[in-house]
Amino acid sequence: MSSASSDSNTGSLTIAGSGIASVRHMTLETLAHVQEADIVFYVVADPVTEAYIKKNARGPCKDLEVLFDKDKVRYDTYVQMAETMLNAVREGQKVLGIFYGHPGVFVSPSRRALSIARKEGYQAKMLPGISSEDYMFADLEFDPAVHGCCAYEATQLLLREVSLDTAMSNIIWQVGGVGVSKIDFENSKVKLLVDRLEKDFGPDHHVVHYIGAVLPQSATVQDVLKISDLRKEEIVAQFNSCSTLYVPPLTHANKFSGNMVKQLFGQDVTEVSSALCPTPKWAAGSHLGDVVEYGPREKAAVDALVEHTVPADYRVLGGSLAFQQFMIDLALRPAIQANYKENPRALVDATKGLTTVEQAALLLRQPGAVFGVMKLRASEVANEQGHPVAPASLDHVAFTAPSPASLDHVAFSAPNPASLDHVAFIAPTPASLDHVAFSAPTPASLDHVSFGTPTSASLDHVAFEAPVPASLDHVAFAAPVPASLDHVAFAAPTPASLDHVAFAAPTPASLDHVAFAVPVPASLDHIAFSVPTPASLDHVAFAVPVPDHVAGIPCM
């Protein structure tokens, strides 16, 4: 037992599940952690998974099952498993613990280790895995949402004397280990569970004894039995630590409230119940969740299929191949996730093939920005690669206080939306913003670019490429103007409507030029620098002809 100062806690703990069906159930996320962990501890259900872990791990792998002993209470073993993982975390290692199935379902050491690690100041998290319940849903093909579903551990069910709801599905785990506290499972107390089931469902109700197949050579067990059959020794002998019982609802208990159906749907109870809650049918060897194949409602739905058209708001996959691969790698690789969290700018800059819009979306680090790039309406897809175009109706880009701290540029790639009329940053403008760039053609309706107080400290340029919008009438920087700003540039032709460029106190010390290309706008009436005028300003350049009404450069 140990604790450490959070200042020096470089270790971490990740708990993951390997699933039930050998390697087939291991998620890509878990595999990525296996490949990047410093050390892997595991308790798995088969040797193939063990071999796969060892093949893919970069560091040592240790089997926690060695801590089990026939004469040891399981709880003590679980405490020791947790402590073994924690000791490696305390040594500063990136630790991965893998448990078969889902690591949070009937896994005591995983929860204990996570709780203690967090209390000691270490990073700790759990990754999901495929549980035997998930496996059961697929093999038995019943939907837990149709009738509702309750799940119990067999011993806990008996200890708590819980009343089983006969109107819904019930799942009972570990029926082969009723009342067992050590590693050796024996099933002498199954009869107590049978007594309980007969009390609630009667002796003739059908249940399913289920064991999901593990190895490719294994066969799934899904034996349909009467509850009274569970008293037979030859049946009970087939139960083991992996045995689960599925208890379907009683048919007669599956009824809707006619009054509530009317209130919710305004329809007859018979019509609604057939659509939302079909009666379960039971027969040995058949699938357990039979459906209404082609009743009147189903036939009408099938007939309507040929007339279906793609909805206007349906979105297709978009984004460049580079953006798609970036997001796939980000989802799968823990190391990339950490780098993205620490320094998104560096990671984005190092990724080739991203458009400026995609770069901006990644730097915002918001789910909405990613969906905006990757899920597009047909009208937004510009080419076969799915590169998006800016919507024609966009009239402004606005960042409210506080603007995202990591934003370093706002970039519009060709074509920019024709209706864009302003780009506005409300206080505080992000400290990392270094440029606002419009590529050809800049929107014709753009009339101002404004930065609220304080303007970003790192901003070094505002650039408009040809043609600059004819409607632009001002570029305004509120106090304080960023110290790193070194130029404001307008490419030919400079907008005819521009009437001022204004810098509020203090003007940036690094500003070295304000440049206007031919022709200089006829409407320009002033360039204003507030006190103090920047010491580094080396020119204000006007190409021929200069507007007659521009008398000079006022210095305030």
UniProtKB/Swiss-Prot annotation:
Oligomer and partners: Homodimer.
Listed InterPro entries: 4pyrrol_Mease, 4pyrrol_Methylase_sf, 4pyrrole_Mease_sub1
Pathway(s) this gene product operates in, as recorded in its UniProt entry: Secondary metabolite biosynthesis
Region of interest (Clasp domain), residue spans: 251-377
Annotated region described as Precursor leader, given as residue ranges: 378-386
A Pfam family per the record: TP_methylase
Family indicated by similarity: In the N-terminal section; belongs to the precorrin methyltransferase family.
The record's note on its domains: Within the homodimer, the clasp domain wraps around the adjacent subunit to position the core peptide into the other subunit's active site for iterative intermolecular methylation.
Binding site for S-adenosyl-L-methionine: 100, 102, 105, 174, 212, 243-244
Key words of the record: Methylation, Methyltransferase, Repeat, S-adenosyl-L-methionine, Transferase
Any one Gene Ontology molecular-function term assigned to this protein's record: methyltransferase activity
Residue numbers bearing the N-methylaspartate modification: 421, 434, 447, 460, 473, 486, 499, 512, 525, 538
Residues that make up the propeptide removed upon maturation: 543-556
Organism: Phlebiopsis gigantea (strain 11061_1 CR5-6) (White-rot fungus)
Post-translational modification: PgiMA1 automethylates at Asp-421, Asp-434, Asp-447, Asp-460, Asp-473, Asp-486, Asp-499, Asp-512, Asp-525 and Asp-538 before being processed, probably by the M64 family peptidase found in the genes surrounding PgiMA1, to release methylated peptides which then undergos macrocyclization with the N-terminus of the modified core peptides. Peptide backbone alpha-N-methylations change the physicochemical properties of amide bonds to provide structural constraints and other favorable characteristics including biological membrane permeability to peptides.
EC number(s) reported in the record: 2.1.1.-
Domain of life: Eukaryota
Coiled coil: none
General function of this protein: Fusion protein of the methyltransferase pgiM1 and 12 type II borosin core peptides; part of the gene cluster that mediates the biosynthesis of a type II borosin, a highly methylated cyclic peptide with potent biological activities. Type II borosins derive from the C-terminus of the fusion protein, and it is the same protein that methylates its own C-terminus using S-adenosyl methionine (SAM). The C-terminus is subsequently cleaved off and macrocyclized by a prolyloligopeptidase to give the final product.
Active site residues according to the UniProt entry: 74, 78, 100
GO biological process: methylation
Ranges where the record places region Methyltransferase domain: 1-250
Enzyme class: transferase
Name of protein: Methyltransferase/ribosomally synthesized type II borosin cyclic peptide precursor pgiMA1
